[in-house]
Structures are given as structure tokens and as C-alpha cells.
Curated annotation (Swiss-Prot):
Protein name, UniProt field: dCTP deaminase
Species of the source: Psychrobacter cryohalolentis (strain ATCC BAA-1226 / DSM 17306 / VKM B-2378 / K5)
Subunit structure: Homotrimer.
Pfam families: DCD
Pathway entry: Pyrimidine metabolism; dUMP biosynthesis; dUMP from dCTP (dUTP route): step 1/2
A molecular function GO annotation: dCTP deaminase activity
Family of this protein: Belongs to the dCTP deaminase family.
InterPro entries: dCTP_deaminase (IPR011962), dUTPase-like_sf (IPR036157), dUTPase_trimeric (IPR033704)
PANTHER family reported for this sequence: DCTP DEAMINASE
EC number assigned by the record: 3.5.4.13
Length: 191
């Protein structure tokens, strides 16, 4: 497997709809000239943006967190240009971008250092071959202070790894009917 460059990312997005909407360059400023957390195509990756819909974890109902039987009341919905995550808590969000991963590609997501340096960790599982959808993002606030996440700005970087032509997977995410295939919006745990 080899990591793919900006040229490959642009080609796959523009000719095959791998990323929609797609930004061919790096965006660092908004229309008013204010600095943003960058997003768009980088040398060997794509920096995704957070959509303006969040689910912030709350313990107001004192439910048990169970991935096999997840209670939606564990979250408060927040819509807006920013989201405040309580100390030592987390929030779910989604990418603005919709992904269509080719059969011979595995995509790994890493958090941006701008957030990591503030104690905010982004977690996403790999985007498997032939998976498609909005990526659900998990933001952990590891600090004992409230933390702010910005919608419409960069939050994580996707790295694309392509297998050799003679080593394409036998069974893709789509082939096995993965439970998160085609997800739109912030998607909670499914079993």
C-alpha cells in the first residue's frame, strides 16, 4: 500500500466524486479575511470540515453508556457555527464532505494538531474500501475546561492508502453490507 498525493486526491474527487463538496487547494481564510483552521487538499491528505450539527454528551438522565443499546437521550443536539464541549466530555459531529471510497483504498483519519494542542482529540475509525457517507466525528475534550469546536473549518485530515493492483480486497465494506454504509448526518452506534 502506498499513500496518495494531492494530484491523486484531486483526480479522484473531480473525476470520480470521491469527496463532495471538494476543495482543490488549502483554505486558510474566510471571505472576510479572518483566519480559519485550514481545510482542503494538502500534500498527502485532505483536511475535512465539521458540519454545523453536533450531539453533545450529557449525563442529565443518568443512563448507562452501552454501545449495544445506546440511548439517544445521552446527547443534546446543538446546531450552530460552534459547539462548546464540557470539561472531560465529548461530542459527535459529522464532516461536511460526503465520501465514496474506492475498492482499492483504505482511508485513515487523524486529528488536526491545532485541536490536539488544545487537548481536543478527534477519533474516527478507518474508512474502508467501498464505504460511502458522511464521516461521524468524535471530539474528546481531555481538559478540565470547556472546549470550542468550529463548524465549517478544518478538524481532521484524511490519508488515502491504495493497495497494489494484485492485492485488492476480496470483500469490501459494501459487499458485506456494513451497517454504516450511506450514512448521512451524525450517526449514533448501531449493532
Amino acid at each position: 500500500m502506498s499513500i496518495k498525493s494531492d494530484r491523486w486526491i484531486r483526480k479522484m474527487a473531480e473525476e470520480h466524486g470521491m469527496i463532495e463538496p471538494f476543495e482543490a487547494g488549502q483554505v486558510r481564510f474566510n471571505d472576510a479575511g479572518e483566519r480559519l483552521v485550514s481545510y482542503g487538499t494538502s500534500s498527502y491528505g485532505y483536511d475535512v470540515r465539521c458540519a454545523p450539527e453536533f450531539k453533545v454528551f450529557t449525563n442529565v438522565h443518568s443512563v448507562i453508556v452501552d454501545p449495544k443499546n445506546f440511548d439517544e437521550k445521552s446527547f443534546i443536539d446543538v446546531i450552530g457555527d460552534e459547539c462548546i464541549i464540557p470539561p472531560n466530555s465529548f461530542a459527535l459531529a459529522r464532516t461536511m464532505e460526503y465520501f465514496r471510497i474506492p475498492r482499492d483504498v483504505l482511508t485513515i483519519c487523524l486529528g488536526k494538531s491545532t485541536y490536539a494542542r488544545c487537548g481536543i482529540i478527534v477519533n474516527v475509525t478507518p474508512l474502508e474500501p467501498e464505504w460511502e457517507g458522511h464521516v461521524t466525528l468524535e471530539f474528546s475534550n481531555t481538559t478540565n475546561l470547556p472546549a470550542r469546536i468550529y463548524a465549517g473549518e478544518g478538524v481532521a485530515q484524511m490519508l488515502f492508502f491504495q493497495s497494489d493492483a494484485d492485492d485488492v480486497c476480496e470483500t469490501s465494506y459494501k459487499d458485506r453490507g456494513g451497517k454504516y454504509q450511506g450514512q448521512r448526518g451524525v450517526t449514533l452506534p448501531r449493532t
